Every structure is written in C-alpha cells, then in structure tokens.
Amino acid sequence: MATQASVEWIFNVAGSAASSSLDKAIKDAGGSENFSKYVITKFYDNYKDCIDDSGVYNACIGRAKTIDKALNDPKVAERNEEWYTNVATISRLDLELAELKLMLSNLGIKREERVLNSMFSVVREKGRSSNVIMMKQNAVKMIEEGKLKIKVERNETYTESLKNKIEELECIIDAFEKGKDITIDLDAMNGEVKLDGNSCSYNSTAALVSTILGTPIKMYNESGQPLFDVGNYMNPKNIIEKMIELEIPIFKSDYRNNESPDFDSWNERSNLKIVSVNDCHAICIFKFENNWWCFDDGRLKKHNGAGYPLIVANSKFQIDKILISGDIELNPGPDILVTLNDYITKYQLKLECTFDIFLEDDGSITYTCYMKLESAEAIGSGRSKKEAKRIAAYDILDQLGI
C-alpha cells in the first residue's frame, strides 16, 4: 500500500528512468505489457515533444496524490473501474502511481534536455573540437512571439566595469536567430600602461582586451605587481590565457593566436591585432577608417606596417572610434556613455534603458534604445546596441543641459 510520502519517490527513480525506455521502466516496476502500451499511448506520446509541460507535471502530481488517498480507502479504489489494467484494483492503483512517478521523474529531469533539443541542434565541426549551434525554427518562432528569452549567464566574479562585454554577447545572441553577420563596433583604447621599457607584452595585451571589453582593464595591483602575472613568459599569448583563467570575459571565439590552425584566415580579416616588432617588442594595432593605427606602450600613432601578428581578434570587431587620454589633437573627448555614467554616479540617479530589435526590409537589424533619466526621455536607433544607446544618451544629456 502506498502512502502520501511515496510521491517523493518520483525523484529517486530518475536514474533508472533516464537510462532506460519508459516501457522497460514500467515493466521493472511490475507493470504488464498491456499496461506499458497503455501508459505510452495515453501519456508519453502526448507530452514527449511538448515544450511547456508544467500542466502535465501538475496533473501528474495531483493524480498521484489522489491515488495515494484511494489506496488508503478500498471503497474509493473500487469505484475507479474505468482504469485499464489486468491486475487487481489495489495493484492497479500501485502501478498507476508508479507510472505517474516515472513520468514525473522524466518531466523533472528530462525537461531541460527536451526543451533544448526542441530548439537547438549541435553540429560538430569535422576534425575540430569546436561546435556549431543551430537554432531551429521552433525557437525562432518563440522568440518572434516573445515566448523565449535568451540570456548570458553572468559569473558572479565579473565586475561591474565589464558590463559592455556582456552587452556585446547579448547583442550577438539577439541577432543570432536572424542568420545575419554580426558586427560589433568598438572603441579602441588602452588599458593600464606601465612605461618601464619592459612591459610591452602587458601593455599591448591590455589594449586589445580593453578594446574588446569596452572598458580600460586594470593590469597591476597597488604594489605595482601584474594582476595577470606570467613570470618570465611575458608573451601576449600567455597573458591573455592568464586573463581567461582568472575569469576575465574574453573567450576563445574572440581571438586566435599564431599557433591556431585557422590563424591565417583570421589574420586576413581581422581589424584588431597584437604584432611583434623585431622579435623584441609588442604593440596593439587596429584598422580605423581604412588606416592602420597602433598603441605603442600607450602612445597612439600611425602604424608603419612593421611586425608580424601574434594575436588577431575576430573580424566581427570593428573600430569606429579611438579613445585616448591627454591633450592630443586626435582626442575625440570623453565617450558620451562615460559622461552619462559619470553624471548618474555623481548625482546617484537611476537610468531606465530598454532595447527593441527590428528587422528592416533589406534584411538588416536595427536596434532601438528607449532611455529615461529623471524628466528626460530619448529614443536612439542604430546598427548596434552601443550605437543606439549613444544616440539616446546624446539626446538625454542635451535635455539636461550637460
């Protein structure tokens, strides 16, 4: 005889249910061939391809509890003669309870797997360890209907200053289902620079990573020691790997080093690189308005073409602005988003910012940013989230007289 507590058993059977067919699991629980066919026909076929199975789950829980009560009251049990089975009433109820528990274990443990399989497929690249994730039509339809949201998991160790990188990843995912080439507009910038004549590897890596992240990265602690110390192996390849190890949000898909098998093809298309000059110096170079520039130990200057590449960034990254410090003629001034953030921080204000995505007639994607700060409201549109946000920020600051 079952008790109310037996409902909790549904999660303990998950191991056997996950490793065998539902048919075998039912038979192992004491069910007959006919009963197994009945269960699969009545229940399994109805929910196996369903994405939202919460209704089935709740129905099973309710039914299991009802059966538990019936098992403690033979008169109630005898009235349930419509249930199809070839065993005595009590055994029949025990079997249905077992069957419901198996279903619940499948619903609880297998749901995530079934949902993912219904929306995505993974294609393994031949001869490579990387995978291509394909979004199925089912997922695209759900996104269009607003029933599916894709978010980037945010590691707790990511600092507030790295939000731009997260937004970048979200931008890629937003456009992913449209099957379009992704272009990320970046601001070329330095990270923390040390001018001791021996830190070019750190300086060049800081510039490349800061540009990709969208914020100057701190490279040294208060004692002046490198935060991403690689000892005597001061090579940008080692430094960037150390950054990844310490959970700076730079990913393998963001760059290739000169030991990668596809390095040459990446190098041809890349707009942002670290190059070695005379085998003794490293600089960060980037393409801006069809000209190549470089950060050489923090100093901005035209690149003369010397050197060979060590690290190249993904071609999706394109430089649309240069941020440099000091009284330099090319200095475009503080970025509008930095100015806005400083104003918000200074006066402890709350900024409301949301985005919409629109597919244009030519197949391109347009982002619209809706921004509100105090009494000021603005709308900005652009080819990227950052561009849309900048346009809205200009309008907001203009309304506030800043």
UniProtKB/Swiss-Prot annotation:
Q: What are the record's GO terms for cellular component?
A: host cell cytoplasm
Q: Which UniProt keywords apply?
A: Host cytoplasm, RNA-binding, Translation regulation
User: What is one Gene Ontology biological process annotated in the Swiss-Prot or TrEMBL record?
Assistant: regulation of translation
Superkingdom of origin: Viruses
Gene Ontology MF terms in the entry: RNA binding
Where would I find the DRBM domain in this sequence? 334-402
Q: Where in the cell is it found?
A: Host cytoplasm
- Signal sequence annotation: none
Q: Which SMART domains match?
A: DSRM
Site (Cleavage) at G333, P334
InterPro entries xref list? dsRBD_dom (IPR014720), NSP3_N_rotavirus (IPR042519), NSP3_sf (IPR036082), Rotavirus_NSP3 (IPR002873)
Similarity comment: family membership: Belongs to the rotavirus NSP3 family.
What is the documented function of this protein? May play a role in stimulating the translation of viral mRNAs.
Q: What is this protein called?
A: Non-structural protein 3
Q: Which organism is it from?
A: Rotavirus C (isolate RVC/Human/United Kingdom/Bristol/1989)
